[in-house]
Amino acid sequence: GNPIIGEGKPENQNHAIIFCHGQYLQTLDMNQDNYLGEAYKMRNLLEGFTGNVRIIGFREHIFSESGGAVAHFAASNELVFGTMVQRFLAWPLRVRFHYGHPDVWDKVWAFSSGGVSKASRTLHVSEDIFGGLNAVLRGGEVEYEEYIHCGKARDITFTAANAFEQKISGGNAFQGLSRDFYRAGKSFDLFRLLSLYNTGTGLFASSTIMFWALYWFTLTIACLALIGLENFTVDTQGNLYSDLGRGGAQGDSQVYSAEWLIQLGFIMIW
C-alpha cells in the first residue's frame, strides 16, 4: 500500500527529524535562500533558547518581488505578515505559533514531543501551526526576532497565489474543528483567547461578514437613491423627514445622508 498515510510534507518533516544532528532544527522550503552576513547571526539567535522557549521565528526577504504584479502583491503580503503582524502576535498577544519556514526549533524537545507539525490528511491542511500550538499547550514559548532574516521566493502567477490563499483559508476553517484549538480555548485566558480567534479563524469570519455587509450596503444606498431618499431631515424633536416631501431643511433641522441611517448614526444625535 501507500507508505504515506497523512500529508506528504509533514510526514517527511517528522520522519527526517531522527536523521538530524545537533540540538536545534530549522525548517526550510525548497526555494529558500540565505546570506553569509545573516548566517553569522545564527549563533546569537540560538542564544535565545533559554527557559521554555521552543521556537524562535524571524523575518524573510522576498527576492521574487520583481517577477510581476502578482509577485509584487505576494511579496508585500509576506512582508506585512512576516514583520509587523508576527511581531505583534508574539508580543503582547502571545498567539504566535509555528508558520513553517524559517522558524528554528528546539530539536531535542520536538524529537520527543510530537514533532514540528501534524500530518492527518484533510484536517491538518495548515500543518505547521499545529506543531507550534502543540508546543504552547505543553508549556513552551515562542519568540520572534527581527535582527536576522533569510531569503524566500513567493508565488509569481495568479493561479499559484490563488491556490495558496485557498489553502490558508481552508486550513483556518479546519483549525476550528481540531481538538488542539479546543484545548487552547479551554486553557487560554480571555485576552489570549480573543487574540487567537481574531488572528485565525475569526479573521476570515469577520472578512466574510464585512464583504456581505458591503454588498448589501451598496445595494441599499442604490435603492434609496432611486426612491429619492439620498438625504433626510431630522428636526429638534428627532422626527425623520424625507427631503423629497419637505423641501429641504427648515429652522433648526439638520440634514443627514442616508449612510447615517443605515450605519445607526442616530446614536450621535441622541
Spans of model-derived segments:
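Basic/Trp-rich segment in TM-proximal cytosolic loops or flexible interdomain/linker regions
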Residues: 158, 167-270
